[in-house]
Amino acid sequence: MVIILRHVRVFNGVNECDIYLIGTAHVSKDSIEEVEKIISSVSPEGIAVELDDRRFFSLITNEEKKVDLKKVLKEGNFLKFFIYLILANSQKKIGESFGIKPGSEMKKAIEIASKYGLPIYLIDRDIDITLSRLMDRMTFKEKMKIFWELLNSDEEDLELDDDLLNDMVKNPEKFIKLLKEISPTIYEVLVDERDRFMAKRLFELSKNKNSLVAVVGAGHVEGIVRYLKKLENGNDIDLMELIKVKKRKKSLKKLLTYGISLTIISIFLYMICYALNNPELLKMITFQWILFTGGLSALGVLLARGKLITALVAFLSAPITTLVPLPLAAVGTIAGLVELKYREITDKDLVGIINAESIKELLNNNLFRVLLVATLSNLGASIGVFYCLGKFIGFLG
């Protein structure tokens, strides 16, 4: 049986409430069957599910929220979007190996609530907030590791058998410990913060109720129980803090971006002034700046199998945009928008990324191609900038 049932009685300051936590594997057929049995036997006054508004809508309508790709490009949220796709793709592939759709046990809980006229409560944090906080907290090394995993993922990496899936549910602490070791940041944002968020939501919902059932992933059960006990003992959890995308960090990031850009501009202008009396040196500096920033940015577009017109635009714009510290003026944004103009993006492209079985399939997907063009053109220009700066500093030395 791929399921965990934990019962905890909580005094919420108003009354005592029995909370039954059903910990499931989100891709297990057994989970669906057991959810109905447990809910029927417990007869709760409400059912809570590990969903937010967006995922609830997607689950009950089988429709995905439309992606505003222009907004993704203009805001530079390429990696955040990639991570969302990785999570969706991974869960879907694992589910397919067991002949079950991800989230089916949540859908079953919703159907049971409707059948018995019970209120349904969405207790998880908004997925966009979770991913934004993850991006703010992750180090550059962690972000690059995820991007590398995307490019090198293999279908075999996602293969699970029944024994392993049972072990994941019965002993989630082993896998939580492994996640902590791989990336403490991912564990804290994707697991621990959401444990706190859902525990607080359940604690508040339990007021004036005798019993509740909550259907959550097995990896969240112990954390939710732990935080429910802390809440019972007077240790409050600030939900506003957990949904805040820290602007202070964004300001610091923006300040750092401006600082790096101003340093680059200062070195570049100093080299221009230094070479004013030496026309040959001035030509060489200008030529190298255009060649390496523009050339490597255009190469990034071509490596992403972008359009020739996009590569030309990247070549012409990179020498200028690398000196402008604005996201909207970044060569990746410009290249991505140009590529988007020549590639029709449909809902099938989003579904295609999630369903992709290989890198070849991804590279034939228009949506993925646009995002890759934006990412690699930015990367190429950045490599060109630092190569030129190294050469310029060498001249001064």
UniProtKB/Swiss-Prot annotation:
Output the Pfam families linked to this UniProt entry: TraB_PrgY_gumN
What keywords sit in the KW lines? Cell membrane, Membrane, Transmembrane, Transmembrane helix
Q: Does the keyword Transmembrane apply?
A: yes
Membrane topology, as annotated:
Multi-pass membrane protein
Q: Which CDD domains match?
A: TraB_PrgY-like
What GO cellular-component annotations does this UniProt entry give?
plasma membrane
Keyword Chaperone on entry: no
Q: Enumerate the InterPro entries for this protein.
A: TraB/PrgY/GumN_fam (IPR002816), TraB_bac (IPR005230), TraB_PrgY-like (IPR046345)
Q: Which domain of life is it from?
A: Archaea
Subcellular location per UniProt equals: Cell membrane
Q: Where are the transmembrane segments?
A: 255-275, 284-304, 308-328, 370-390
* NCBIfam families found in the cross-reference section: traB
**Name under which the protein is recorded:** Uncharacterized protein MJ1365
Q: Give the organism the record lists.
A: Methanocaldococcus jannaschii (strain ATCC 43067 / DSM 2661 / JAL-1 / JCM 10045 / NBRC 100440)
